[in-house]
Amino acid sequence: MYAEWLTGAGFDVQQAHNGLQALDRAFVYPPDIVVTDLNIPGIDGFELTRRLKGDQRTCGIPVLAVTGYAAFASDPGRALRAGCDAVLPKPCSPDELEIAIRRLIEPRSLQIKPNA
């Protein structure tokens, strides 16, 4: 559902079926942003985020958690402490998702990159 929304909004979406696959793909083809649920198979979204933020190749990639995970309700700061840049509770609308993503990726596109 989210992939369809994002594709319709003009984003190039790559999907992973579990946390390890997402991590491997991010290392090989670093995305502009990682959008993840916190409750995913394999390594969960918390561990996925910690590993992404702990690796030099992917530490600068923003992570948006979109979740209805029960632990989020009892401790909303847990995802942020794991390294998520933002958290969006489910259910969310297509507009809410797009706005959250653009808030995270647009500042990156404005950064001045040093000459190589």
Task: Label every model-predicted segment.
Residues 66-67:
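Hydrophobic/aromatic residues positioned on beta-strands within the core alpha/beta folds
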